[in-house]
Amino acid sequence: MLIIPAIDLKDGACVRLRQGRMEDSTVFSDDPVSMAAKWVEGGCRRLHLVDLNGAFEGQPVNGEVVTAIAKRYPNLPIQIGGGIRSLETIEHYVKAGVSYVIIGTKAVKQPEFVAEACKAFPGKVIVGLDAKDGFVATDGWAEVSSVQVIDLARRFEADGVSAIVYTDIAKDGMMQGCNVPFTKALAEATRIPVIASGGIHNLGDIKALLDAKAPGIIGAITGRAIYEGTLDVAEAQAFCDNYQG
């Protein structure tokens, strides 16, 4: 299982939100590129970037920062989400050296777009499903739909999606542990690999994900915990690598 540091971009700075609320943000650095350097030096094998302004505006806003990080680390897999709603945007990021693009809102509102994107950019597409009480939320989490996460995830199996990033909104940024039972249920209900996100606080939460014994869970995204020091990237990755269970 991969430990994937998150860099959330808002107005060019690296921030963390609580429960997806833009007004409840903490700035951790005004230099996201050096923040990326910190996690790379800490031994991370993949980075998770989110253009928060982009998620709300429906188009990339912090694209230059993303490109700068991708250029600096050409051999590091980078995944970017937030405001990806056209094939042109995907092409822009892929050309910039980004390994994976995460389609969120558009995947819920126009699932056929995912099939289109997978066809145009095979192996590059991840679907981001953000949920509240098992139902999918969209538009920077401002709207909660009547679509169930597992039902939607199964829809994408035939498209060739590389992974699903599953975020439990109620847990995100709260550092109270992630929703292990639902993450496990999702991983077991679909053939698509799942990346857990939201609520990871310490090594105990990483252990809980591993203890779930769901081979489909291939990664865990962590944000606030690594910024506030309750989780160490290198230590957590070593724990995953050596886990015997």
Swiss-Prot record:
Its EC number is 5.3.1.16. Gene3D superfamilies: Aldolase class I. GO terms for cellular component: cytoplasm. The active site is at 8 (proton acceptor), 130 (proton donor). The keyword Lyase does not apply. It is found in: Cytoplasm. It catalyses: 1-(5-phospho-beta-D-ribosyl)-5-[(5-phospho-beta-D-ribosylamino)methylideneamino]imidazole-4-carboxamide = 5-[(5-phospho-1-deoxy-D-ribulos-1-ylimino)methylamino]-1-(5-phospho-beta-D-ribosyl)imidazole-4-carboxamide. Pathway: Amino-acid biosynthesis; L-histidine biosynthesis; L-histidine from 5-phospho-alpha-D-ribose 1-diphosphate: step 4/9. PANTHER family: 1-(5-PHOSPHORIBOSYL)-5-[(5-PHOSPHORIBOSYLAMINO)METHYLIDENEAMINO] IMIDAZOLE-4-CARBOXAMIDE ISOMERASE (PTHR43090:SF2). This is 1-(5-phosphoribosyl)-5-[(5-phosphoribosylamino)methylideneamino] imidazole-4-carboxamide isomerase. The lineage of its organism: Bacteria, Pseudomonadati, Pseudomonadota, Gammaproteobacteria, Pseudomonadales.
